[in-house]
């Protein structure tokens, strides 16, 4: 936990606090299950227990291909894994499934472990599901077309979200400027940004001045 001394091979748990804050903004009652050990049985039993008293389960980490990544296995044993991995960046190793609880199928979203990937996949993938489960009809945020103040290339067939800030050019025209680093572990990049630019699967190149789809954080955080 933040504030405690870390030991070798440990990192601070930022995701739990970020997710709880984002969920509470959506009016959710959050039941925090804490940090789980890298133990297959413990993870399975914690997910089973959580499914009995909650309408949606949300995890972060433990969903990649490491020896200690047991979340996918637990989902399959307790219910069904509907998909694992999407052609997106950041957040490729996201998974969605359900856990059987008597006569209910409780949805579970297994988010990646990197802080930026967690926040981006929550805002663009998990958030609409939370709103849908809450009875909301308007589950998709508004995007705005704004000229880019950057150039970038990307892989065709993959959807990407870039962290950007609003800037003014010499003519006082509003543009979006890309955060200089792409690492999924740089949480400060989210704090320093005004929103996300979404590049669809068919886009392979953005040149400075091109119109891009801009999602202000105000659309998904308020």
Where are these regions (language model features)?
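Short acidic, glycine/serine/threonine-rich loops at helix termini
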Residues: 2-6, 43-45, 69-71, 98, ...
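Short, ordered loop/turn segments at secondary-structure junctions
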Residues: 4-5, 35-38, 62-63, 80, ...
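Phosphate-binding glycine-rich loops and their immediate beta-loop-alpha structural context
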Residues: 1-59
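Short Gly/Thr/Asp-enriched flexible loops that form oxyanion-binding sites at enzyme active sites
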Residues: 66-78
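Flexible glycine/proline-rich
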Residues: 76-222
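Short glycine-rich anion-binding loops that position phosphate/pyrophosphate groups of nucleotides
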Residues: 62-65, 113
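Loop/helix-junction capping segments adjacent to catalytic residues or to phosphate/diphosphate-binding pockets
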Residues: 13, 40-41, 65, 119, ...
């Amino acid at each position: 936990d933040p504030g405690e001394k870390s030991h070798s091979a440990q990192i601070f748990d930022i995701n739990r606090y970020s997710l709880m804050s984002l969920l509470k903004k959506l009016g959710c009652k959050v039941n925090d299950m804490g940090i789980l050990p890298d133990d297959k049985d413990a993870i399975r039993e914690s997910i089973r227990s959580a499914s009995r008293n909650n309408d949606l389960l949300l995890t972060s980490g433990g969903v990649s291909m490491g020896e200690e990544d047991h979340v996918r296995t637990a989902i399959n044993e307790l219910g069904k894994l509907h998909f694992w991995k999407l052609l997106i960046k950041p957040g490729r190793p996201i998974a969605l499934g359900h856990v059987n609880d008597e006569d209910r199928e409780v949805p579970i979203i297994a988010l990646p472990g990197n802080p930026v990937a967690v926040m981006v996949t929550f805002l663009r993938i998990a958030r609409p599901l939370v709103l849908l489960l809450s009875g909301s009809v308007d589950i998709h945020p508004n995007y705005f077309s704004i000229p880019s103040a950057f150039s970038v290339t990307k892989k065709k067939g993959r959807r990407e979200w870039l962290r950007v800030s609003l800037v003014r050019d010499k003519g006082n025209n509003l543009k979006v400027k890309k955060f200089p680093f792409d690492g999924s572990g740089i949480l400060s990049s989210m704090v320093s940004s005004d929103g996300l630019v979404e590049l669809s699967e068919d886009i392979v190149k953005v040149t400075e001045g091109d119109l891009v789809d801009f999602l202000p954080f105000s659309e998904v955080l308020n």
